[in-house]
Structure formats: structure tokens, C-alpha cells
């Protein structure tokens, strides 16, 4: 039956839950494209016959096949677009390096698209926030407070905050500092977040 394979392709995506990426169905796409080619060739033959022999009884069949072509095309585009949205979401969830199990489910073109998206996102983040850039993938949920209490794990020396205030970070001293200013030092092991 017409368009059956295209609808099955869409159902395959619907069966996969959000956040999952089913294996790229290259065989299904190829079968749909072959069906579209056959429908197009049949339409071309019938259009030529309708023109030369004046057979207007072929027009409904031609229109039906044309509608099937359009539906197949819409289904393929929807399949590919949904996969790209899922791949884009994976970049935000897993970072710039995908697990091999996910890469296995992607086509070569999808891997190329992912790598280009990754580079574009990195370029955009470097253009924000001055010299270091701004990692917009870091805090996917807004912090509960702008200031946090931290304990100094080792002697660091003077630390300047944006308002010009300098703080002496000595081992075991505790401070109430802006979260975004402390995150780098927490990652370096100079400070630790004190949870009350």
C-alpha cells in the first residue's frame, strides 16, 4: 500500500521515548525513495499519455500518486528533522563527546551535522563573556542563590571580586561569595561549597 513504509518510519520514532535515538533506518529511507521514484515514473508516463491521447480519466490517478509523493516527502523530512532535534538535545545533555552507543545509531551525515553544531556552539560561547567566553551549557537550571558559602581548602592568596573588594583566601577560612566567581576555584580544588 502507498505511504505505508513512510508511516512506519514515523511510528518508529514515536516508539522511542524522549532522549533516546533509535538507529538510523537507512533501509527504510531507501525503500521510500524507491517507491517515490516508481510513483514519479508512473505519473510521468500517465501525464504524457493524458496529453497525447487526451485521456482525462487518468487525472485522478495522477493526482492520487502526486499526493502520495508529497506525503512520503513530508514523512521523510519529519523523520530527519526529529532526529536532528534529538541529536541537538544530546549535545546539551552529554556535552561535546557522545557515548559510542549513541554514535553507533547515527548516520555519517548526522555525525557531520553534530560536529558542525558542536563547533558552532563552541564559537558562539567563546564570543560571549570576554576573554574566557561563557559556557552556556553549564547551568541548565538556574541556581537557587547568587551567593554561596565556600571554605578555602588551601592557601590561595588574594582574590578580587568584580566590585573591587579583595579577599584573602587562607586555608580553612570561610567566605560568602558570588557563585559564578567561585565555580572555577571550586573546580580547581581551591574552594569547596559548604552546604548548610
Swiss-Prot record:
An MF annotation (GO) of this entry: chromatin binding
Cellular localisation: Nucleus; Chromosome
InterPro entries: GINS_A (IPR021151), GINS_bundle-like_dom_sf (IPR036224), GINS_Psf1 (IPR005339), PSF1_C (IPR056783)
SUPFAM superfamilies: GINS helical bundle-like
Signal peptide: none
Oligomer status and interactors: Component of the GINS complex which is a heterotetramer of gins1/psf1, gins2/psf2, gins3/psf3 and gins4/sld5. Component of the CMG helicase complex, composed of the mcm2-7 complex, the GINS complex and cdc45.
Role according to the record: Required for correct functioning of the GINS complex, a complex that plays an essential role in the initiation of DNA replication, and progression of DNA replication forks. GINS complex is a core component of CDC45-MCM-GINS (CMG) helicase, the molecular machine that unwinds template DNA during replication, and around which the replisome is built.
Family indicated by similarity: Belongs to the GINS1/PSF1 family.
Protein name: DNA replication complex GINS protein PSF1
Amino acid at each position: 500500500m502507498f505511504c505505508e513504509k513512510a508511516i512506519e518510519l514515523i511510528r518508529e520514532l514515536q516508539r522511542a521515548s524522549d532522549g533516546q535515538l533509535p538507529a538510523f533506518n537507512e533501509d527504510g529511507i531507501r525503500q521510500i525513495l524507491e517507491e517515490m521514484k516508481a510513483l514519479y515514473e508512473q505519473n510521468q508516463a500517465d501525464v504524457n499519455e493524458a496529453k497525447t491521447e487526451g485521456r482525462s480519466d487518468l487525472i485522478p490517478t495522477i493526482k492520487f500518486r502526486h499526493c502520495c509523493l508529497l506525503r512520503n516527502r513530508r514523512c521523510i523530512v519529519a523523520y530527519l528533522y526529529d532526529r536532528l532535534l534529538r541529536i541537538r538535545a544530546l549535545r546539551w545533555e552529554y556535552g561535546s563527546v557522545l557515548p559510542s552507543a549513541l554514535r553507533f545509531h547515527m548516520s555519517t551525515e548526522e555525525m557531520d551535522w553534530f560536529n558542525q553544531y558542536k563547533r558552532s556552539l563552541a564559537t558562539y560561547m567563546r564570543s560571549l563573556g570576554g576573554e574566557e567566553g561563557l559556557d552556556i551549557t553549564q547551568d541548565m537550571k538556574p541556581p537557587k542563590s547568587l551567593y554561596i558559602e565556600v571554605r578555602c581548602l588551601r592557601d590561595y592568596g588574594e582574590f578580587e571580586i568584580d566590585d573591587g573588594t579583595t579577599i584573602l583566601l587562607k586555608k580553612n577560612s570561610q567566605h560568602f561569595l558570588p557563585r559564578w566567581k567561585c565555580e572555577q576555584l571550586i573546580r580547581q580544588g581551591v574552594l569547596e561549597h559548604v552546604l548548610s
